[in-house]
Amino acid sequence: MLKSRKLFPTALLTLLVAAFSLPAPALANHTQATYFEATPLLLSSTTRAATIAQLQRLGVRALRVELSWHDVAPGSNSATKPAFDATDPNAYGWGAYDAIVTEAARLHWKVLLTVTSPAPRWATSNKKAPYVTRPDPKDFQEFMTAVGRHYGAGVTYSIWNEANHPAFLMPQWNSNGTPASPRIYRGLYQAGYTGLQAAISSPTVLFGETAPTGYSKVNVHREHSRALLHDVAPLAFLREALCLNSHYRKSGSCSLLPMSGYAHHAYTIAAGPHYVDPNRDDVAIGTLSRLSNALGKAAAAHAIPANLPIWLTEFGVQSKPNRFLGVSVAQQAEFDAIAEQIAWSNPRVVAFSQYLLRDDPVGGAPGASVHGGTVGFQTGLEYVNGKPKPLYASWPVPLTATKSHGGFSLWGYVRNATGPTTVTVLVRLKGSHSYRTLKTVTTNSLGYWTLGTSARGQFFRVRWTSPEGVRYEGPPIK
């Protein structure tokens, strides 16, 4: 995408002093829960308490946790399934997952539990690492009954992480070049949903959890076996999993799948949050309308419930030192806020999630995990050494600024707000080294606010002081 529009300085200082205001744009008519995923730090007993304290200061009230089937299952590295009642939660070693869910309950935080691969070795078709090949639906159904009995109706469930990516589910493609993973996933989802129903009468379950990019078709003749390692584009995956053809018409006798929402990971590239991928089956944050339209067509075909909400359950902006997808840390803070505003502006989106508090170590090139390597994500609020990035200061009080009607439209959010509160908006002119108060604005009951202004500052930032006296000040936004 193009970089964020550069804001031009005002020609008259009186505009700054008077802070002439334009009518504020209307707020979107829906709420948007914000989830945070910091599973590696939360799973460790040595970092859990400090991480929870950090998340509280940042304004977190909901967690996404990826629950690995392999981590908790008995005999998970054995080729032979042990003799045990797979529907009995007492047969599993829930370990640190229980500690996370218990702490979240104490804090009255919501929990989204994504149950995912790797599977136990004995539950896969080839019994080979990384244990993601054709997991057995019957085994998964029994496991999900145990999961539901253990964690109950107090959490939201999501079935499988990025099933359209070969690092999490194999095979992605059949030897003839047709997609394989969508129908495998459909079987796993149906089994998992049935398993949860045996434990919970009306479970809240998300479908999809799709990665943002992939291939709509592959050329096995040209690429041979390499073609089968490509990920499946999310909308191509959606259609095949729902038994729809390219025109979103039912193909076959598949019934409607029950679900509470569609989960997606709308990552974008270094071009920024408004980037439009030329593959129309890809869905990044800048092309959310593609997913909205696809879900509408799928509902019209009676493949899914009508008016299905979108959950953006994993998102982050890569920063340097990621040499493939990273932007500067200043741009990371700006792009992250823009992406959240895009999600907030879409009335179908009910959840947005930040992936990583602390960066991973720098790993291999994108796709390295398919070949047994590691991929480091630099989407965190902190560097790998724990030093904060600008995003750490901006995430609790995100701010965007865009040209609008002869002036600028500002949008912001105070995550720690528990009701209407006041925020100080600051502006800095070109050539100036200091900020001045533009206006004090009042948020709505959820903490969101907007402001239209004719004051053309070069940089804007916000300042908010909590009722406990903790001061939050975001970084400069161009």
Feature annotation, model-predicted:
Residues 1-12:
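Bacterial N-terminal signal peptides that target proteins for export
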Residues 18-26:
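C-terminal segment of classical bacterial N-terminal signal peptides
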Residues 27-62, 66-68:
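Boundary/entry segment of secreted carbohydrate-active catalytic domains
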Residues 36, 63, 104, 147, ...:
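Conserved, mostly hydrophobic/aromatic
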Residues 58-227, 269:
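Substrate-binding cleft and catalytic face of glycoside hydrolase catalytic domains
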